[in-house]
Structures are given as structure tokens and as C-alpha cells.
């Protein structure tokens, strides 16, 4: 056992301290200024007792907190927690030698997440499937009965989702993950992690899965993209468009966070004639942007582009949209192709957009709106743009994954 003083919260949400011999220690579920007694395992500590609690400590919102690995910071009061999220953005920018105005963090409300990944395991003898999230720093499963982060309609479906998971556990090597999205027409579930080398899911298991899906009144169930049950098309509204989601497609996790980011993008596109929406997905930004400007949209996923194109005709009052399936890593939109583009909106995956950023930097584009789920790769791409003459005007942190260490952001560049 060691008594430790927590000096700060690290990037993964753990408390940072120094042991008696000066070595770094990482202690989860602690807060700055606290003195704790911890059981050490190498550099990691587990709190045994809080000797001096922080005045910023609050009661967690969830009974599973501390064991479930989904949340790391429920025990921290809202104001310092949000300030810490903004500081993580500032730190990553500073590592690339960048400074800018960081606006107040947009905080997504609890009980609003519409997209989750639930893991399924076999229950005990005579029991059904267990469904939940992984334990903190473990492969073990925490069976959940509540989740204050998630939309209550999805939480209410947990028993039906557990019944759906049972047929997918027929093979001992299967470890299913249910990727669940709440849409306007019901739950859309894509299931991965099912052993398929031994002939795949049996006919009996498919039949039982379809029956469970019907009883749960799900919109659609797919197995790694293959539809095994479809009562109705999963639909989402993006701007003025209604989009039919392809299986396994990306959608922002929290509608309020999506709305905030879209509003920022549309505000920056005011007065533009042509906008490029890169890594457009199914059109999260494309359709709202098309209310104010012509839009060129590019995305690697061909099914996403097909869904986007199919929705254009049913969306009234939009300016022209051109969309293509394009790998923006292997075939980024060239600077010459951006010659008549006024604004670029780019929302890459966590790895960033190094190849595409080089082409934007070489172009004559006057404004870039960067949306990112990874401040580290955003900062690296931002450095390239700034070196090419852009100014990073401001950044808005977006706390979409509330109580987790993850932070998203929207940055505005001009030149």
C-alpha cells in the first residue's frame, strides 16, 4: 500500500501521482488534490481508501460505475470536468506549437446517446445471454441494467437485445458485439464477432434470431452487414433529408452533439458558393450545408454514398449535391480539384487526414472547418495547414462521449 497525492488527471482519465521513490503512478477514479491509499501493481494503483477527498468529488450517476469501463469521470463535478476536456485540446495543440482561442466546451446531455456497442456472453446454466460493457481494463463483462449516458429507449430494450444475442452464441468461439443504433424507425443492430469458419450461423439460430428480433420490434438486424431480419428501413433525418442507413454505417453518437457541430459548419459556410464535404459519411454535414451552398461530398464507403444519393431527391430546397465514393487516403481530392471551392469541411476518422490535408494546404481554399474525434491527429493536420498560411482562428471542444476521456472538436481555419 502507498499513500499518494493526486497531482492531475491524465489523458486517459486516471489520476497522476508520484510514488515515494519518485516513480509515476496512475490511479483511476481519483481527482486532483486528493490523497489516497492505493494498492500498487507496477505503475498502476487501485484506490483502497480516499484519505482526503476533493471538494470537486460528486456521487456517480450509475450503479455500475467503477467496475464498468464505459465511463471514467462520473465522480467529477461538471465545471472542472469540462475545463479538463478543453485543456486536453489545448495540450495537444501546444505540442504542435499552436495556440488559438478555445471556446467553452459543448456538453452533450446525459441519457442521449443513440449508438452503443454491447458485448454478449453466455450466462450461467439455465440463464440467457449476458449483455453489457467490458470491465475497466479487462475483457470481463459487466452485465448492465442501467446506463445514464444512453437514450432511455435503448436502455429499455436491453432485455430484448439479450434475447436477440442468444442465438449468436451457439458456437463456443463466438463473442458477439451488438452495434445498436436508435433510428427514427426503431433499433438497427449490426452483429459482429460471431464465429463463421465452421459453416456460420445455423439455420435454427437464424430462425431464433429473427423471432427474437420480431418480438423486440427491431427495425433491422444484420450479421456483419448481411441482413437476417428486416421489418423496416432504419431512417435518420439529416437536415432536410431522410436517409436510409446502410448496415454498419457511421452516425454521430449523440444527436445534440451532431446538431451543435452541424450548426457551426453551416455558420462558417454562409456566403460560400461551393463547399467540399470530405469524409461525408451518409451526409451528416452534406445536407445542412446544401441549404446554403453547392456541395461536393466524398466518402470511402460506397454504401454510404449510395444512401446519400438516394436521399437527395426527397430533400426539398437544396442546392446541387455531387457525391462520389472515394478513398481519400489513396486518392485525396487534389488541390486543382478544389480550385473553385470556397470552404472545405473535413471530418476524418481517428487517424486524421494527413494525405488530404496536404492537398488542402496546396489549394487556394480560403476556409477550412475541421471536425475531429482525436485532438492529437487534428493538431498534426492543423500544423500542416498553418505552415501553408492558414490561421487556426478558434476551436470548440465537443464533449459527445460524456464522462469518458474522449473529446471531439471543431476547428476553424482561414487565410
Swiss-Prot record:
This is Uncharacterized RNA methyltransferase CC_1326. Residues 1-52 form the TRAM domain. The active site is at residue 373. [4Fe-4S] cluster binds at residues 62, 68, 71, 147. Keywords: 4Fe-4S, Iron, Iron-sulfur, Metal-binding, Methyltransferase, S-adenosyl-L-methionine, Transferase. One of its GO terms (biological process) is rRNA base methylation. Its EC number is 2.1.1.-. PANTHER family: 23S RRNA (URACIL(1939)-C(5))-METHYLTRANSFERASE RLMD, RNA M5U METHYLTRANSFERASE. InterPro entries: MeTrfase_TrmA_AS (IPR030390), NA-bd_OB-fold (IPR012340), SAM-dependent_MTases_sf (IPR029063), TRAM_dom (IPR002792), U5_MeTrfase_fam (IPR010280). SUPFAM superfamilies: Nucleic acid-binding proteins (SSF50249), S-adenosyl-L-methionine-dependent methyltransferases (SSF53335). It holds the Pfam family TRAM. GO terms for molecular function: 4 iron, 4 sulfur cluster binding; metal ion binding; rRNA (uridine-C5-)-methyltransferase activity. The keyword Cytoplasm does not apply. The keyword Methyltransferase applies. It comes from the Bacteria. S-adenosyl-L-methionine binds at residues 252, 279, 299, 347. Belongs to the class I-like SAM-binding methyltransferase superfamily. RNA M5U methyltransferase family.
Amino acid at each position: 500500500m502507498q499513500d499518494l497525492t493526486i497531482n492531475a488527471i491524465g489523458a486517459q482519465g486516471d489520476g497522476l501521482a508520484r510514488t515515494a521513490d519518485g516513480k509515476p503512478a496512475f490511479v483511476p477514479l481519483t481527482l486532483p488534490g486528493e490523497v489516497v491509499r492505493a494498492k500498487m501493481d507496477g505503475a498502476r494503483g487501485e484506490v483502497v481508501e480516499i484519505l482526503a477527498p476533493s471538494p470537486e468529488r460528486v456521487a456517480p450517476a450509475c450503479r455500475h460505475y467503477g467496475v464498468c469501463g464505459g465511463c471514467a469521470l462520473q465522480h467529477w463535478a461538471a465545471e472542472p470536468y469540462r475545463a479538463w476536456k478543453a485543456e486536453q485540446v489545448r495540450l495537444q495543440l501546444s505540442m504542435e506549437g499552436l495556440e488559438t482561442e478555445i471556446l467553452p466546451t459543448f456538453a452533450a446531455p446525459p441519457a442521449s446517446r443513440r449508438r452503443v456497442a454491447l458485448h454478449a456472453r453466455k450466462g450461467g446454466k439455465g440463464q440467457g445471454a449476458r449483455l453489457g460493457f467490458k470491465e475497466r481494463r479487462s475483457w470481463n463483462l459487466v452485465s448492465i441494467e442501467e446506463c445514464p449516458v444512453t437514450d432511455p429507449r435503448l436502455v429499455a430494450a436491453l432485455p430484448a437485445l439479450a434475447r436477440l444475442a442468444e442465438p449468436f452464441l451457439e458456437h463456443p468461439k463466438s463473442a458477439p458485439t451488438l452495434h445498436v443504433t436508435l433510428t427514427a424507425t426503431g433499433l438497427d443492430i449490426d452483429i459482429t464477432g460471431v464465429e463463421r469458419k465452421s459453416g456460420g450461423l445455423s439455420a435454427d439460430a437464424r430462425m431464433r434470431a429473427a423471432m427474437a428480433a420480431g418480438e423486440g420490434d427491431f427495425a433491422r438486424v444484420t450479421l456483419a452487414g448481411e441482413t437476417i431480419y428486416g421489418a423496416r428501413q432504419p431512417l435518420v433525418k439529416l437536415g432536410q433529408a431522410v436517409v436510409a442507413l446502410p448496415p454498419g454505417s457511421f452516425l454521430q453518437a449523440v444527436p445534440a452533439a451532431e446538431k451543435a457541430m452541424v450548426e457551426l459548419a453551416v455558420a462558417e459556410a454562409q456566403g460560400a458558393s461551393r463547399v467540399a464535404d470530405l469524409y461525408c459519411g451518409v451526409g451528416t454535414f452534406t445536407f445542412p450545408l446544401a441549404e446554403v451552398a453547392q456541395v461536393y461530398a466524398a466518402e470511402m464507403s460506397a454504401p454510404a454514398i449510395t444512401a446519400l444519393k438516394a436521399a437527395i431527391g426527397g430533400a426539398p430546397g437544396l442546392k446541387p449535391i455531387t457525391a462520389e465514393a472515394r478513398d481519400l487516403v489513396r486518392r485525396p481530392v487534389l488541390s486543382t480539384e478544389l480550385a473553385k471551392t470556397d470552404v472545405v469541411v473535413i471530418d476524418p476518422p481517428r487517424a486524421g487526414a494527413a494525405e488530404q490535408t496536404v492537398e488542402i494546404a496546396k489549394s487556394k481554399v480560403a476556409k477550412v472547418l475541421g471536425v475531429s474525434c482525436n485532438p492529437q491527429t487534428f493538431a498534426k493536420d492543423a500544423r500542416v495547414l498553418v505552415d501553408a498560411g492558414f490561421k487556426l482562428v478558434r476551436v470548440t471542444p465537443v464533449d459527445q462521449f460524456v464522462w469518458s476521456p474522449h473529446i471531439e472538436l471543431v476547428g476553424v481555419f482561414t487565410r
